[in-house]
């Protein structure tokens, strides 16, 4: 089945070669629009679950945009989004977002959640019972408040400092991969914004930042031109579009808005080598990256970009097949081996061919030579 899929992809490559600069046709089942304030929305109806829909607000905002005195605040802000807003105050008259959602069967941590990464922050309210119009309206109001109307109360900020600190402690205590990544980034990304950009930030700043610094970050970067509303599920697309336009059009776009930059990654004349150790990492892993520039966003709607994606998949698949054949030897030269082509670690502005393999302590050079020789 897999080989047939890649054969079909190869045939498709031959067919589209003459139309590479053309844009891919948009799926008509998607409703895509942009409000006057710059906010984009995407709506799609499906019948996967009757009477259920998922709601998202996605933001092109992450820890890479933090100043040195803001390290960790993109992630901190994500936590604060559940601790009071214009229409969800956590009072008897105005329940919190969490209380309102759970009262309607939307579980916090499962259907109500968020994540912060280097370049994006995404909030979701999923498995929403949409047959009740009032529930739909309140769900959109949650996204509306996340966009621009968080309270960011002093007392709530201080309470959340301890929560973040415990999350940081737990991650460092139980996640060797997290600690190794923190060691690797300053070496691999030396001299770039990416050398210190992990969303968890630094606890010195989390424990002591002034309230105003968090509010400044929020109002600088949480704005319509960097946000998108996404609704997918058992909804009437026309009605949902009207609701989105009514709820989100009034959110203001700040004057003299800061430019949202995407930061480059330096090329290197000599190979960069990072040798990392952690007591909880029992297997020696070797990863080889061969970098290349990422495709500009403006070109990602073209047939050329789609074709190049198929080519990358074919290359990674064929190398993977060679690695599997190598692992059939007795004894196996590597403990594990894999190949992929995609984003270079945490940076959107670079892609890479990545070859990863686990090596035997007693035969490091032999494992390395076998994997590279494929």
Where are these regions (language model features)?
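Bacterial Sec-dependent N-terminal signal peptides
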Residues: 1-23
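Histidine-acidic residue clusters that define the catalytic metal-binding segment
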Residues: 23-32, 123-126, 133, 183-227, ...
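M16/MPP (pitrilysin/insulinase) zinc-metallopeptidase core fold and M16-derived inactive scaffolds
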Residues: 54-126, 189, 196-200, 317-351
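M16/insulysin-pitrilysin zinc metalloprotease superfamily fold
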Residues: 84, 125-160, 326, 344-374
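Acidic/histidine-enriched alpha-helical segments
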Residues: 93-99, 151-169, 236, 255-269, ...
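Non-catalytic, conformational "gating/processing" segments within enzyme and secreted inhibitor domains
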Residues: 149, 156, 161-162, 169-173, ...
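An aromatic/glycine/proline-enriched structural segment found at the starts
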Residues: 228-284
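Structured mid-domain segments that build the active-site/substrate or prosthetic-cofactor binding neighborhood
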Residues: 286, 293, 305-374
């Amino acid at each position: 089945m897999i080989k047939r899929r890649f054969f079909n992809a190869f045939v498709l490559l031959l067919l589209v070669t003459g139309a590479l600069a053309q844009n891919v046709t948009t799926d008509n089942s998607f409703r895509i629009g942009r409000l006057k304030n710059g906010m984009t929305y995407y709506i799609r109806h499906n019948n996967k679950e009757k009477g259920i829909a998922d709601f998202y607000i996605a933001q092109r905002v992450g820890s890479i945009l933090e100043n040195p005195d803001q390290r960790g605040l993109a992630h901190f802000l994500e936590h604060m989004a559940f601790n009071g807003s214009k229409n969800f105050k956590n009072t008897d008259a105005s329940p919190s977002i969490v209380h309102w959602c759970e009262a309607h069967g939307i579980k916090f941590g499962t259907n109500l959640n968020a994540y912060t990464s280097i370049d994006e922050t995404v909030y979701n309210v999923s498995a929403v019972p949409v047959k009740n119009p009032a529930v739909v309206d309140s769900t959109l109001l949650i996204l509306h408040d996340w966009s621009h109307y968080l309270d960011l109360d002093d007392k709530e900020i201080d309470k959340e400092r301890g929560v973040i600190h415990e999350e940081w402690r737990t991650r460092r205590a139980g996640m060797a991969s997290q600690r190794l990544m923190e060691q690797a980034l300053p070496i691999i990304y030396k001299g770039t914004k990416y050398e210190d950009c992990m969303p968890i930030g630094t606890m010195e700043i989390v424990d002591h930042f002034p309230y105003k610094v968090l509010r400044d970050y929020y109002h600088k970067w949480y704005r319509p031109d960097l946000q998108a509303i996404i609704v997918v599920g058992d909804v009437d697309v026309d009605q949902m579009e009207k609701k989105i336009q009514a709820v989100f059009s009034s959110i203001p776009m700040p004057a003299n808005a800061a430019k949202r930059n995407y930061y480059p990654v330096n090329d290197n004349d000599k190979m960069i080598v990072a040798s990392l150790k952690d007591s909880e990492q029992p297997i020696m892993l070797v990863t080889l990256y061969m970098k290349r520039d990422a495709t500009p966003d403006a070109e990602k709607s073209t047939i050329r970009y789609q074709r190049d994606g198929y080519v990358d998949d074919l290359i990674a698949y064929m190398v993977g097949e060679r690695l599997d054949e190598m692992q059939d030897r007795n004894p196996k030269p590597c403990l594990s081996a894999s190949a992929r082509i995609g984003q270079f670690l945490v940076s959107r502005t670079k892609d890479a061919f990545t070859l990863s393999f686990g090596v035997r302590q007693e035969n490091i050079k032999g494992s390395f030579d076998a994997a590279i020789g494929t």
